[in-house]
Design a protein with these regions (language model features):
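Glycine-rich Rossmann-fold phosphate-binding loop(s) that bind the pyrophosphate
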Residues: 3-9, 27
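Gly/Ala-rich phosphate-binding loop of Rossmann-like dinucleotide-binding domains
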Residues: 12, 16, 151
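Glycine-rich FAD pyrophosphate-binding loop
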Residues: 16-36
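Conserved dinucleotide-binding and phosphotransfer motif residues
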Residues: 18, 103, 154-155
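Short loop/edge segments at beta-strand edges and connector loops
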Residues: 26, 111-112, 161-163
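Short beta-to-alpha linker loops that shape the active-site pocket of alpha/beta-hydrolase fold enzymes
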Residues: 28-30, 115, 148
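Dinucleotide-binding Rossmann-like beta1-alpha1 core, especially the glycine-rich loop
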Residues: 40-118
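Helical element adjacent to the flavin cofactor pocket in flavoenzyme catalytic cores
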Residues: 131-181
Length: 182
């Protein structure tokens, strides 16, 4: 697997736990230095198109109840989010609320008075109302990445850092990868 960010580490964890031989290759001196390390790290079933929301819902149980020993602290902590709307965005906000409700995600509609109480920094003359998502979470991306890496190694995966793949070829049974360190 090339890349030891969250995607590569989670794949290594799954494959190694399934008994597959895994080598995880990372060009940086440590995993998670790029997009994983800069992730906004929100878990929101209300975010994204329907396919993304379905994947988010499907992963909720894992994040709330990871396998024993996966992480020392919870991976998720509650975080509310607001979707604000100007006067011209009311119809879109209504469609969003209906679309989310159809997939089982309930949101609370805040009028301008409740919105001003919830977010006093927002300009009350600009935003008419908002949807409040009380089912969102902050994700501990570092704990998640470390859980995947630790679990992958415990299941036999090897992690190589500071090397780059130069060429790769499949021989019919496995991949052979030439690395920058020889």
């Amino acid at each position: 697997i090339i890349g030891a960010g969250i995607a590569g580490a989670s794949l290594a964890w799954r494959l190694a736990r399934a008994g597959r031989p895994v080598v995880l290759i990372e060009r940086e001196p440590q995993p998670g230095m790029h997009s994983t390390g800069r992730s906004a790290a929100m878990f929101m079933e209300s975010y994204g198109p329907p396919g993304v929301r379905a994947l988010t819902r499907a992963s909720r149980d894992f994040y709330l109840h990871p396998p024993a020993g996966f992480a020392e602290a919870p991976l998720l902590s509650p975080r509310h989010a607001l979707f604000v709307a100007t006067a011209g965005q009311q119809a879109a906000l209504g469609r969003m609320q209906a679309d989310l409700a159809a997939s089982g995600t309930t949101m609370t509609l805040l009028n301008s008075e409740l919105l001003a109480q919830a977010a006093p920094a927002l300009k009350p003359d600009l935003f008419q109302n908002a949807l409040l998502d009380e089912q969102g979470y902050d994700m501990d991306v570092h704990a998640l990445l470390q859980g995947f890496l630790r679990g992958a190694r415990q299941a036999g995966a090897r992690l190589l850092t500071g090397v780059q793949p130069l060429r790769a070829a499949h021989d019919g049974q496995r991949w052979r990868v030439a690395l920058s360190d020889g």
